[in-house]
Curated annotation (Swiss-Prot):
It comes from the Bacteria. One of its GO terms (molecular function) is mechanosensitive monoatomic ion channel activity. Pfam families: MscL. This is Large-conductance mechanosensitive channel. The chain crosses the membrane at residues 14-34, 81-101. Homopentamer. Belongs to the MscL family. It is found in: Cell inner membrane. It comes from Bdellovibrio bacteriovorus (strain ATCC 15356 / DSM 50701 / NCIMB 9529 / HD100). The keyword Methyltransferase does not apply. PANTHER family: LARGE-CONDUCTANCE MECHANOSENSITIVE CHANNEL, MECHANOSENSITIVE CHANNEL MSCL.
């Protein structure tokens, strides 16, 4: 059982996927920090708000100065500011991945065409092997 597991893990695609997941998680943390610590404060200055994460609606109609105060009171809230942060995070990650894939596709070499292994018989237009001297379909002689 251990041998099968080792064989499974050592396959190239499993290791590649593991590395991709680890790098993706680290990249996600960088983007989250960028959204939370850099982008959101700049955007909130333009909107006159200090912090997106403090944008919320109290569903029972009461008023609370902060989201933490509303949570401490145990009321139901609609936290649209936190949602906006997550949406910004997703958009930046998705766009970054798009740019990376686009760059990788440009760097990817075009695959070489497969070697030609057949030719056409001049008499019957059938496909025959390149080394054939006689057509298997019509029997006519074919120049090599």
């Amino acid at each position: 059982m251990f041998k099968e597991f080792k064989t499974f893990i050592m396959r190239g695609n499993v290791l590649d996927m593991a590395v991709g997941i680890i790098i993706g998680a680290a990249f996600g943390k960088i983007v989250t920090s960028f959204v939370t610590d850099v982008l959101t404060p700049v955007l909130s200055l333009g909107m006159g708000k200090v912090d997106f994460s403090n944008l919320f609606f109290v569903l029972n109609g009461d008023s609370y100065p902060t989201l933490d105060a509303a949570k401490a009171a145990g009321v139901a809230t609609l936290n649209y500011g936190t949602f906006l942060n997550v949406v910004l995070d997703f958009v930046i990650v998705a766009f970054s991945i798009f740019l990376i894939i686009k760059a990788a596709n440009k760097l990817k070499r075009a695959e070489e065409p497969a070697p030609v292994t057949t030719k056409e018989c001049p008499e019957c237009c059938s496909s025959i092997p390149m080394k054939a001297r006689k057509c298997a379909h019509c029997g006519s002689a074919v120049a090599s």
